[in-house]
Amino acid sequence: MEQPGPITDIAKPGIKAPRDLAISLREEVARILGRSSIGFPGAQPVSFARKHLEELRREDYYVCEKSDGIRYLLYLTVDEEGQEVQYLIDRKNDYWFLPRNSMHFPMPNDIQAFHRGTIIDGELVMDTVPGTNGRKEPRFLVFDLLALDDKAELLNKPLDKRLGYFSAYIYEPYKKLLQQFPQEIPFMAFKVEMKRMELSYGIETMFREVIPALKHDSDGLIFTCRTTPYHFGTDPHILKWKAPHENTLDFRMRLNFPLVQATEAELDEGFPEQFTDYDSVPQAELYVFCGNDGPGGSKYELFPDPLYIAEDEWETLKALGDPLQDRVVECCLDAENRWRLFRFRDDKNEANHTSTVSSVMASIRDGVSDQELLSAATAIKESWKIRAQKRKEQQQQQQPKH
């Protein structure tokens, strides 16, 4: 049985729920959210394109840093005995049970009572603790709230209201708990923090202050529309910005090993005339996910460019001793426009969908640099101020006159 205490692996943050329990939990979450689907309900961003500069001028957006962690929904619920339990839900829709008594989320006016039917959106990261020679601590960084105490009306409220509910009803009572019982912190699975949000024109603040002060890796910015409701699945109003050269794609990798002719000596040793050479660098094909819309009803479509694997990289991959065939891999373009292996994405069931691939490729071809974002900030701010003034005037007109 796992003991309470900080998690050490953000990819395996607890005990994975067995299939039958996971199905039951998925149905619970769908019921709370009023959905017929039991699939992963989390919102997913689209890649930032040049057209989105106009979107930032036209609509109210918040901006935060894009953490290089793992996305989870935190589900606060009860077990069959009525005891407080929590699960982390990953993008594969697997449920990870946090060890009992490793977390507590008290109600605002009762430190013993706890939240249930509550779904929080965030990202799990490992922060490096300053002055500890590299010691890591897990943090759950919150950026949205889907449901509070079995009520999902929040889904239709704007982002600032959703975050306001999280702060008032969950985060402030949680912070008071830590202040009252600091001796319990070492036994907690992770610390919870609210992700710092700036108004969309606070881009310079993000680049100059927020990102340099982070204790974890960050690989871009996320812009989220203030006024739109929470959207299950791909949300066109959540914009993921990366510097054009840092854009990556998730593919399914398939390796084709060369056939070689046996030498005379190998034939004498009993080798067949031709055999597969698993030592040489294989041809690595990349495939994108297309649901059932691929060629001939296939789920996958061959990406036009292969994965380039250097000799030394192949030696490293072989030395891992792990299965390589058909794994999901995150790839980036190098200076010579070759796709290179960045990391394995075992946290994902599928490669990027063909629509995502098209979106990211457009971002790479027509990407917006950090300098262009900074230059756009002034116009974004001016437009925001004009909208804010109009809202203020409308509110004044609607007030009853005495």
From Swiss-Prot:
Record field: catalytic activity: a 5'-end diphospho-ribonucleoside in mRNA + GTP + H(+) = a 5'-end (5'-triphosphoguanosine)-ribonucleoside in mRNA + diphosphate
One Pfam short name: mRNA_cap_enzyme
Entry annotated with the keyword DNA repair: no
GO CC list: mRNA capping enzyme complex
Transmembrane segments: none
Keyword annotations of the record: GTP-binding, mRNA capping, mRNA processing, Nucleotide-binding, Nucleotidyltransferase, Nucleus, Transferase
GO MF annotation, one: RNA polymerase II C-terminal domain binding
Top-rank taxon: Eukaryota
GO BP terms: 7-methylguanosine mRNA capping; positive regulation of transcription by RNA polymerase II; tRNA processing
Residues at the active site: 66
GTP-binding recorded as keyword: yes
Subcellular location: Nucleus
Coiled-coil regions, chain positions: none
InterPro entries per UniProt: mRNA_cap_enzyme_adenylation, mRNA_cap_enzyme_alpha, mRNA_cap_enzyme_C, mRNA_Capping_Enz/RNA_Phosphat, NA-bd_OB-fold
Family assignment from sequence similarity: Belongs to the eukaryotic GTase family.
Subunit details: Heterodimer. The mRNA-capping enzyme is composed of two separate chains alpha and beta, respectively a mRNA guanylyltransferase and an mRNA 5'-triphosphate monophosphatase.
Name of the protein: mRNA-capping enzyme subunit alpha
Species annotation: Neurospora crassa (strain ATCC 24698 / 74-OR23-1A / CBS 708.71 / DSM 1257 / FGSC 987)
Lineage of producing organism: Eukaryota, Fungi, Dikarya, Ascomycota, Pezizomycotina
